[in-house]
């Protein structure tokens, strides 16, 4: 049986300042670094060993992966970074303070933008300082692929090809896999893995730095789920 560990990145600087982050590349906070290291210690304590690691193109997830692997003496394992595991793109909300945005547009509207499965936030303009239109890490993508806004449905649609082409084949080969990514890209994976409804998935919370361990049988059916904590 194969295992998959999902870790949402540790607290970021913008989690701390209560800003919409999305595809903006912000760093871990001091607390976030400690959360990532703690995840690695828990992984080691539970004897989890990995054959392959995946993460996004964003620093907060990459560093979370590296801290966790270093603490568990597995920094050497193969690692693949992909834009498909990036956080959901929050469009024109990126960079805005969540409290200020709620005061401007109303709590209900902001809640819909954040939590609705199908509703898109306002699209970001290419000349916005928080747009990724000219970010060279996406230079090899067709320009129309780089999003201007995403909801969870769109996020799931871009995560799934990577699951089908890379993650699922690894698990079917009996490999143990670790993924360090983001609240919404991991929520999308969780929706698929656990067959969660469109309505119920919006209430799922992913704690920063908490390893979630799935055990699969040889047909990729989940036989166990465990959250690692003290």
UniProtKB/Swiss-Prot annotation:
E.C. numbers: 5.4.2.11
Record-marked site positions (Transition state stabilizer): 182
Keywords from the UniProt entry: Gluconeogenesis, Glycolysis, Isomerase
EC top class named in words: isomerase
Gene3D superfamilies, A to Z: Phosphoglycerate mutase-like
Stated family: Belongs to the phosphoglycerate mutase family. BPG-dependent PGAM subfamily.
Entries under NCBIfam families matching the protein: pgm_1, PRK14115.1, PRK14116.1
Listed name of the protein: 2,3-bisphosphoglycerate-dependent phosphoglycerate mutase 1
Organism: Lactobacillus johnsonii (strain CNCM I-12250 / La1 / NCC 533)
């Amino acid at each position: 049986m194969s295992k998959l560990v999902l870790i949402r990145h540790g607290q970021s600087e913008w989690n701390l300042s209560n800003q919409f982050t999305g595809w903006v590349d912000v760093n871990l906070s001091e607390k976030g670094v400690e959360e990532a290291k703690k995840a690695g210690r828990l992984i080691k304590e539970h004897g989890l060993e990995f054959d392959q690691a995946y993460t996004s193109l964003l620093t907060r997830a990459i560093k979370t992966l590296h801290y966790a692997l270093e603490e568990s003496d597995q920094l050497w394992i193969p690692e693949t970074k992909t834009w498909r595991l990036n956080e959901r793109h929050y469009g024109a909300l990126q960079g805005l303070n969540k409290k200020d945005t709620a005061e401007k547009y109303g709590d209900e509207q902001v809640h819909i933008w954040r939590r609705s499965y199908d509703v898109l936030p306002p699209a970001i303009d290419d000349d916005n300082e928080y747009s990724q239109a000219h970010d060279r890490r996406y230079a090899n993508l067709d320009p129309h692929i780089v999003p201007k806004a995403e909801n969870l449905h769109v996020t799931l649609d871009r995560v799934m090809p990577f699951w089908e082409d890379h993650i699922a084949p690894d698990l079917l080969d009996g490999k143990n896999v670790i993924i360090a990514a983001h609240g919404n890209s991991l929520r999308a994976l969780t929706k698929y893995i656990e067959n969660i409804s469109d309505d119920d998935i919006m209430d799922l919370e992913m704690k920063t730095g908490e390893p979630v361990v799935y055990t699969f049988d040889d047909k990729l059916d989940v036989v166990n789920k465990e959250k690692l904590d003290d």
